[in-house]
From Swiss-Prot:
GO terms for molecular function: ubiquitin-protein transferase activity; zinc ion binding. GO terms for biological process: protein ubiquitination. Its cofactor is Zn(2+). This is Probable E3 ubiquitin-protein ligase ARI1. Might act as an E3 ubiquitin-protein ligase, or as part of E3 complex, which accepts ubiquitin from specific E2 ubiquitin-conjugating enzymes and then transfers it to substrates.
Amino acid sequence: MDDYFSAEEEACYYSSDQDSLDGIDNEESELQPLSSKRSNTQVITQESLLAAQREDLLRVMELLSIKEHHARTLLIHYQWDVEKLFAVFVEKGKDSLFSGAGVTVFDYQYGNSSFPQSSQMSCDVCMEDLPGDHMTRMDCGHCFCNNCWTEHFTVQINEGQSKRIRCMAHQCNAICDEDIVRSLVSKKRPDLAAKFDRYLLESYIEDNRMVKWCPSTPHCGNAIRAEDDKLCEVECSCGLQFCFSCLCQAHSPCSCLMWELWRKKCRDESETINWITVHTKLCPKCYKPVEKNGGCNLVRCICGQCFCWLCGGATGSDHTYRSIAGHSCGRYQDDKEKQMERAKRDLNRYTHYHHRYKAHTDSSKLEDKLRDTIHEKVSKSEKRELKLKDFSWVTNGLDRLFRSRRVLSYSYAFAYYMFGEEMFKDEMTPEEREIKKNLFEDQQQQLESNVEKLSQFLEEPFDEFSNDKVMAIRIQIINLSVAVDTLCKKMYECIENDLLGSLQLGIHNISPYRSKGIEQAAQFYASWNSKDADKFQPLDSGTSGVTSRPEQASGSRSSEDTICSSSQKRPKKEGSFLNNKVTLLDLNLPADFVDQN
């Protein structure tokens, strides 16, 4: 076994059946917390979305003794971070908390928003005298006719201001009561009231830094809440595994920026990409493409970084038309041989890393097809009269193989950018780059060698072996499983501490390694009592909508391009609430079509 275990891993060997009895489970228990511990990520379904939002609203309403729309405004301002909101309240007080979020709460609250029909009142907007029952008063005391209020609400909702509709009185910053908005709008525009409700509900996801939509295609309708750290990889209940930070497929040990660049580089080049490559250069700070539209060689990116167009090096802003203060670079020379040599070297380097990346990706796909075959072998072995009855070591080894293949595959994309001459050219000297590259490649090769050995042993026809041979292959698979897990952990530690940790520009971070694989998000369960639900009014208020069920994300583990999303966008569906359940409406359809359905 010395040919595929390093000396450091010899302590992990199991040389007998008794030693290896629970080798994998014991090793994993040291690396991971107990399964009984509460998951750090939760799945918020359409049914639990309202409960999740109400749980946070209720906590703020009870602590500050305010109405629901005021609590919602505060939570949106603080990105639905209840703990941060409470911390500001304790440190700075209620007045500072409210003023910072733009919330106006009046000491005197008018008890009734409506007036008797017998009274005659004048609206200061349309200047008409109307019966009292045609007028409505907000908490701030400003009173206008229902038609003017409705028009004001309609404009605000259509302009995307549903979450912060303010009073239309001059210089009044009070937030309008959601119940009044819903009641008035639903009488004339039920579809708009449903849209209003949907925006309020989805603000919990779109304005919440701890919650994001699952990027599955077609959309599964779920959202994921990561309570501790957004730098994690998570598995939705629909089966999709993705990076919570960038919403692309799980890609550690690559950073999000590295994976975005690698994904674009591997994609078939279109005319647009060719044009961008020819006419733009990457900013040395944020790495976004910048186009030069004339003028001198000093270029300023939208992030504020100035750089030289000729060499791409970061510079200051002081310059003349012909020179940049404190900066000099080799002028452009038409040296065709050097250009061709560098282009050839870059191409060969990319080809090498892409070939290894693709090889492990393809191997993982082939091994995934063998899963059923291996399970059949396990089933046959369990029916045989063998001393060994438990074959969980096979499935554990298979799971370990898939995880380590994924790590190996993405490690080549990481190495391409980490040890290239573009991304970190100012962070490392050539000598430092070579030393770190050798350190990383040593660990990468050890992991690769052990993974290939594990794959070979799992493909053995152990269902046809004798007792002694089954015991022997069992020890081999358990030892290799423990070894590749240890090597994966060491590779992550090397990347986090020795490679990325030594960089001055800390924009590259990776999700931590998990011995048991990507964490599957648990179902969300509201901790608020059912009696607390009486404090909230139903959000339908007579609105109607088309009931539909979102499609499940069948095949959501397909190509990387189908699940990648550049921003935290809401699915293009709208809805209301019927019987306290979310129903969906398509806002792209005409209102009359929706009403007919």
